[in-house]
């Protein structure tokens, strides 16, 4: 492993931007293209927003954890919560599915993450939390 970071922050919506910027600053050492940087920032934003809104149901006292690691030219980003978990993971990963239609969310979070990253793994257990692992190979 070339480098690694870990970040913990309260599940407040204003910290989503902080998470994006922190991961961006960390991967700057790989000299990413603007497109790569935008893709990663968008995927991080979606994962953190899911943790806050769905995992913790907007309970700002809870903590979201992000870990990022660089191994050669690949970035791996893990976003984890200890929230309510996802009851039906297969259904949740379907485009346009949302468990909270009253919030006017698009239901495209997982689809966006899958589109902008090379791989997406989601692990979830009801009442235990969710862990999202995203990877992207950089064209450095």
Swiss-Prot record:
One of its GO terms (biological process) is asexual sporulation. Belongs to the anti-sigma-factor family. Pfam families: HATPase_c_2. Keywords: ATP-binding, Kinase, Nucleotide-binding, Serine/threonine-protein kinase, Sporulation, Transferase. The keyword Nucleotide-binding applies. This is Anti-sigma F factor. InterPro entries: Anti-sigma-factor_SerPK (IPR050267), Anti-sigma_F (IPR010194), HATPase_C_sf (IPR036890). Its EC number is 2.7.11.1. Coiled coil: none annotated. The gene is spoIIAB. It catalyses: L-seryl-[protein] + ATP = O-phospho-L-seryl-[protein] + ADP + H(+); L-threonyl-[protein] + ATP = O-phospho-L-threonyl-[protein] + ADP + H(+). It is an enzyme of class 2 (transferase). Binds to sigma F and blocks its ability to form an RNA polymerase holoenzyme (E-sigma F). Phosphorylates SpoIIAA on a serine residue. This phosphorylation may enable SpoIIAA to act as an anti-anti-sigma factor that counteracts SpoIIAB and thus releases sigma F from inhibition.
């Amino acid at each position: 492993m070339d480098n690694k970071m870990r970040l913990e922050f309260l599940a407040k919506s204003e910290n989503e931007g902080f998470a994006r910027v922190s991961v961006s600053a960390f991967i700057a050492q790989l000299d990413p293209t603007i497109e790569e940087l935008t893709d990663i920032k968008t995927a991080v934003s979606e994962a953190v927003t899911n943790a806050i809104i769905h995992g913790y149901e907007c309970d700002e006292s809870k903590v979201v954890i992000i870990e990022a690691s660089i191994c050669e030219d690949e970035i791996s980003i893990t976003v984890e919560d200890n929230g309510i978990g996802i009851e039906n993971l297969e259904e949740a990963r379907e485009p346009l599915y949302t468990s909270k239609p009253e919030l006017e969310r698009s239901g495209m979070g997982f689809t966006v993450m899958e589109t902008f990253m090379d791989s997406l793994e989601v692990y979830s257990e009801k009442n235990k939390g969710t862990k999202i692992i995203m990877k992207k190979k950089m064209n450095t």
